[in-house]
Amino acid sequence: MSIEVRKSIFPSLPIIVFIVFVEVPVLSVIYPLIEVLTIYPLLISLIFSLAVFAYKFQKSEKNLKRLARQIMALFVIFWLLSQITMVVAVESEYHGIVSFRRDIYNAQLSCKG
């Protein structure tokens, strides 16, 4: 792999680290259908991603503007994915309640008849 390819991949590395170590655990904790992770992996991944950002911030003081844009992009991506996840969670909960009420209604109709 050439040096130019590595330089083009490196600015996206914090975004990949943030998505893998922060957004995926947060969304899997928030989303009720895939409650696999507990709070401890969430905290570990949050600490790890903050350590990566602190290292990158300390290493590149001259690129502070680019780093600030990357951090803002990460928060925007996190916010959008959390909003999408919450909409999906609310919709699945709504459909679960509707099917439960429909079953109760059908059971009451069958008992009367």
UniProtKB/Swiss-Prot annotation:
CC per GO annotation: plasma membrane
Domain of life from the UniProt record: Archaea
Subcellular location: Cell membrane
Main location: membrane
Listed transmembrane segments: 9-31, 36-58, 71-90
Record key words, sorted: Cell membrane, Membrane, Transmembrane, Transmembrane helix
Membrane topology type: Multi-pass membrane protein
Protein name, UniProt field: Uncharacterized protein AF_0258
